[in-house]
Amino acid sequence: MAKAPTTKNVGRISQVIGAVVDVSFDGSLPAILNALETTNNGNRLVLEVAQHLGEGTVRTIAMDATDGLTRGQEVTDTGSQIRVPVGPQTLGRILNVIGEPIDERGPVNATQTSPIHAEAPLFVDQSTDASILVTGIKVIDLLAPYAKGGKIGLFGGAGVGKTVLIQELINNIAKGHGGTSVFAGVGERTREGNDLYHEFLDAGVIAKDADGNPTPEGSKVALVFGQMNEPPGARARVALSGLTIAEYFRDVEGQDVLFFVDNIFRFTQAGSEVSALLGRIPSAVGYQPTLSTDMGALQERITSTNKGSITSVQAIYVPADDLTDPAPATSFAHLDATTNLNRAISELGIYPAVDPLDSTSRMLEPRIVGQEHYETARAVQETLQKYKSLQDIIAILGMDELSEEDKLTVQRARKIQRFLSQPFHVAEVFTGIAGKFVAIEDTVKSFKAVVEGEYDHLPEAAFYMVGGIDEVVEKAKKLAAEAA
């Protein structure tokens, strides 16, 4: 652990430009990434050194609002990076970017702290095991299965269901998961963070003591928030704070950790806000020139080692639904599986609005998932692709002009499309339909039967918003009885 200097290195604020603060020192300059401390309106304010400007001045990024700072105000060099509490005491707590509790439940009595910037694990320490993480969501498990210890990206524009999907994954995986979970809320809505916290309390993921108060003992999740209303410094670093907590559970306790990030785009966005203030020349579409470096520094630390694993699920906002935008495009290279949410599918009322032809996974290989699963997934995609290519003909000439074979393909594809929808546990309060968890074996068996035409006699409506194929048969009987 880095020791603080015996005599404190004190500087003074020379200028404040929004979230960026310049500090002048008479003696030695603090190192890049060092944390400096001052007070603002009676609160502790942390500044992170980003640049040495020369003439005894450093340029820093503020981790909180800078309103109220004045020139000449004293700033102290802590002699080390921003450090956050790590370990079991963080479980069941909500922390901010600098590791302070924001749940009004007193201090985090952690015995250890860790710096938020760290090197990625060495290649020799990384694990290469390939196994599937079952989510219970049909479209994901069948067509783009997730890797245990892998990186998963949920791509989607505004309002197509990224946060609901990430909450369902937390519900299906984290609640039944033996290890620990860490949730990093990066630049998203405070309301969603609040809802998530109460959901965790209700589900028992955050434990309560005899008086009904939340307690770290028995809790399985740590929450780290830097929400939309926070300055860019906090949003640019909060993902690293969350990751540092997850790394402790992986490296020291040897656990399999789930790391949820909502939203990685806000991490990039905060970096671009700060970048211009730091005097860097913007690159494509106004993003920071260090976009790939920033993303790489974060993503390379999220990995599985011989000690334990971190499986990360990251929501990634796609500006204007354009996947070629530099922010989502830079994320693609780091991911093992991508789940693309499509507005056109959500407009059909099919939820989750996952695009079955655009979502990919390196796990969809016969040697990992088995021959039957692989062939079923490819047959489903082939049927949907044929339907997609016939849509123009249908739009211009109508269904009657198609050959009998093509008509059958279209009917099956429409059933598959509806069968890929699924009621979610977290959406139960809005839809009134009970959520469903479908085992991967049932998913493969059901879709194989549909593709092979075993259920051609059932109506399309029976396939919508159900779990397994047994429910389809049940729903078809109900519909027939209602129509009679």
Curated annotation (Swiss-Prot):
Q: Name one GO molecular function term.
A: ATP binding
For membrane topology, the record states: Peripheral membrane protein
**Top-level division of the source organism's lineage:** Bacteria
> Which CDD domains does the entry link to?
ATP-synt_F1_beta_C, ATP-synt_F1_beta_N, F1-ATPase_beta_CD
InterPro entries the record matches? AAA+_ATPase (IPR003593), ATP-synt_VA_C (IPR055190), ATP_synth_F1_bsu (IPR005722), ATPase_a/bsu_AS (IPR020003), ATPase_alpha/beta_chains (IPR050053), ATPase_F1/V1/A1_a/bsu_N (IPR004100), ATPase_F1/V1/A1_a/bsu_N_sf (IPR036121), ATPase_F1/V1/A1_a/bsu_nucl-bd (IPR000194)
Q: Which PROSITE patterns does this one have?
A: ATPASE_ALPHA_BETA
Q: What is its EC number?
A: 7.1.2.2
Primary localization class, coarse: membrane
GO CC, alphabetical? plasma membrane; proton-transporting ATP synthase complex
Q: Where does ATP bind?
A: 156-163
Location in the cell reads:
Cell inner membrane
* Catalytic reaction list: ATP + H2O + 4 H(+)(in) = ADP + phosphate + 5 H(+)(out)
List keywords of the entry alphabetically.
ATP synthesis, ATP-binding, Cell inner membrane, Cell membrane, CF(1), Hydrogen ion transport, Ion transport, Membrane, Nucleotide-binding, Translocase, Transport
PANTHER family in the record:
ATP SYNTHASE (PTHR15184), ATP SYNTHASE SUBUNIT BETA, MITOCHONDRIAL (PTHR15184:SF71)
Briefly, what is this protein's role? Produces ATP from ADP in the presence of a proton gradient across the membrane. The catalytic sites are hosted primarily by the beta subunits.
| Subunit organization | F-type ATPases have 2 components, CF(1) - the catalytic core - and CF(0) - the membrane proton channel. CF(1) has five subunits: alpha(3), beta(3), gamma(1), delta(1), epsilon(1). CF(0) has three main subunits: a(1), b(2) and c(9-12). The alpha and beta chains form an alternating ring which encloses part of the gamma chain. CF(1) is attached to CF(0) by a central stalk formed by the gamma and epsilon chains, while a peripheral stalk is formed by the delta and b chains.
User: Which protein family is named in the record?
Assistant: Belongs to the ATPase alpha/beta chains family.
Q: Any idea what this protein is called?
A: ATP synthase subunit beta
Origin organism is Rhizorhabdus wittichii (strain DSM 6014 / CCUG 31198 / JCM 15750 / NBRC 105917 / EY 4224 / RW1) (Sphingomonas wittichii)
Its encoding gene is what?
atpD
